[in-house]
């Protein structure tokens, strides 16, 4: 048997490392009999949905304020590794199902979704390297050639920044570019111009968790006005070449059945009208988490009102969970889903959720988390699944830029076969 074909798992290792916010996370290694080693790091969110898979933390206040992950590391070494040794790394579903069964809980709270996901991703990387093919080809096959439109978070608010802005993310979307390389350049130029615009107005240009600027602004509309001004000043046409997108993260300011923004409570119908006004006034193509994760009735109303005009993305609403997505499909709530690997906790379940979305004409947006690492798996995942969209932060901070640079390399590898989703109308509406 050749070196590359002996893909049995020989050893599994894990360690506690730091993410981009200086908080602990897991790094996992999967060693194969052929000498190949797959390495993966697990991200962590700041604004998390109530129905996400459980991220296991130590709770020991004497280490990292209780945020340590030594328990999850121990679970990889003592609970998962002994049961996975000898299994074929190329059988991703068997590996993932085995880990899910060992955990035995409905939300991976026994061993930790962070423990399971680390091994899941490391095994996939080892499998790809064993076959001497890139991860996007390993996961997506010969049709994996669609480069995603980036939704670039350039103004941070909400839980991602220490400022007074209600909405969590204000994004620029280079829909009019003809290639990913061009789209990235457009985004970088608008980002640099936005820095100048903020500076000219005496606003701070410090950045939030995801690399976007985090100034104190009078309202959400002011943030949108600044983006439109930066797009124009950079030499691009708002809405035609570079559009806007929002992550409202409404669950973060939902209290007692009301949406509290601009310092005042508003009824759901009133808030939906407000979002509609923003869509009418600005070149917005996508709104994420426009309502609370359990406000299903209002989600239906929002989708009826704005679903034909803009992309309505469920993040906290769906948490990359096929069961919750199925409910959304049946109730006609949202028309797109945000995909975060650590929300569900395994590669297999992530791919199943994307497949369910695709079969029901629900668009998928592959996403990072606010606590990231240098791991670039989501770039490959976006191409592998032909999702057509990716969220991986701003145009600064190396843990964000690493994903963009990986997509540049993939585009170069594909050569003439590479297709940019924005150029063929497969980005956000």
UniProtKB/Swiss-Prot annotation:
Free-text comment on the cofactor: Binds a second Mg(2+) ion via substrate during catalysis.
Catalytic activity: (2R)-2-phosphoglycerate = phosphoenolpyruvate + H2O
Any one GO MF annotation of this record: phosphopyruvate hydratase activity
CDD domains according to UniProt: enolase (cd03313)
Gene3D superfamilies linked: Enolase-like C-terminal domain, Enolase-like, N-terminal domain
A GO cellular component entry from the record: extracellular region
Residues the entry annotates as binding (2R)-2-phosphoglycerate: 168, 340, 369-370, 391
Compartments where found: Cytoplasm; Secreted; Cell surface
Main location: cytoplasm
Keywords carried by this UniProt record: Cytoplasm, Glycolysis, Lyase, Magnesium, Metal-binding, Secreted
Annotated pathway: Carbohydrate degradation; glycolysis; pyruvate from D-glyceraldehyde 3-phosphate: step 4/5
One Gene Ontology term from the biological process aspect of the record: glycolytic process
The family this protein is said to belong to: Belongs to the enolase family.
Record function comment: Catalyzes the reversible conversion of 2-phosphoglycerate (2-PG) into phosphoenolpyruvate (PEP). It is essential for the degradation of carbohydrates via glycolysis.
Name this protein carries in UniProt: Enolase
Protein source organism: Nostoc punctiforme (strain ATCC 29133 / PCC 73102)
Gene: eno
